[in-house]
């Protein structure tokens, strides 16, 4: 079976992420979306929420599974019997960082390959950071994320006392 793992924080999952997941689902027998716990990044949404949102967003894709993880990515690949890591590149600036990660992963597990995909043009400017900031300030993110993500962000920031919307 040809398996690819698409790791990320997905805080939140965006239309750009979905674009890559959907395209990968046509190239591979199985796509594992691996949601990193990433405590150092202090995610806005909990790991459980991020996993649930991706499950909902990708419900139409039969060969996609979603899992949370807090181990080394190469350990997760071994658990999933996968040898390929999918990463998205929006701009040249992403490449340098991604190349560094790819080389580190290969040093950890020499049989692991990294596959880089670029998003469709209409998704090339979308980032989770931008989506979070727009949502935190009360802006409309409905063209950037799935409706379930809009709802989750609205609920989160309605309860967040540091959000300008609640002040």
Swiss-Prot record:
Any Pfam family hit: CTP_transf_like
One of the GO biological process terms: coenzyme A biosynthetic process
GO CC field: cytoplasm
Gene3D superfamilies found in the cross-reference section: HUPs (3.40.50.620)
Lipoprotein found in the keyword field: no
Reactions catalysed according to its record: (R)-4'-phosphopantetheine + ATP + H(+) = 3'-dephospho-CoA + diphosphate
Positions contributing to ATP binding: 9-10, 17, 88-90, 98, 123-129
Primary location: cytoplasm
Highest taxon above the source species: Bacteria
Pathway: Cofactor biosynthesis; coenzyme A biosynthesis; CoA from (R)-pantothenate: step 4/5
Entry binding sites for substrate: 9, 41, 73, 87
Enzymatic class: transferase
Site feature: Transition state stabilizer: 17
The protein's required cofactors: Mg(2+)
NCBIfam families: coaD_prev_kdtB (TIGR01510), cyt_tran_rel (TIGR00125)
Family membership noted in the UniProt record: Belongs to the bacterial CoaD family.
Its biological purpose: Reversibly transfers an adenylyl group from ATP to 4'-phosphopantetheine, yielding dephospho-CoA (dPCoA) and pyrophosphate.
Identification of the protein by name: Phosphopantetheine adenylyltransferase
Record organism: Chromohalobacter salexigens (strain ATCC BAA-138 / DSM 3043 / CIP 106854 / NCIMB 13768 / 1H11)
């Amino acid at each position: 079976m040809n398996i690819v793992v698409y790791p990320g924080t997905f805080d939140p999952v965006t239309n750009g992420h979905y674009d890559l997941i959907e395209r990968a689902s046509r190239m591979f027998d199985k796509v594992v979306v691996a949601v990193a716990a990433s405590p150092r990044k202090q995610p806005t949404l909990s790991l459980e929420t991020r996993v649930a949102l991706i499950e909902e967003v990708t419900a139409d894709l039969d060969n996609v599974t979603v899992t949370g993880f807090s181990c080394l990515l190469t350990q997760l690949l071994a658990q999933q019997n996968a040898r390929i890591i999918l990463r998205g590149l929006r701009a040249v600036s992403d490449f340098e960082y991604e190349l560094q990660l790819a080389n580190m992963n290969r040093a950890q597990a020499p049989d692991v390959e990294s596959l880089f995909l670029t998003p469709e043009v209409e998704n090339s400017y979308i980032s989770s950071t931008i989506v979070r900031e727009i949502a935190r300030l009360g802006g409309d993110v409905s063209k950037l994320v799935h409706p379930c993500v809009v709802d989750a962000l609205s609920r989160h920031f309605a309860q967040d006392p540091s959000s300008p919307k609640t002040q």
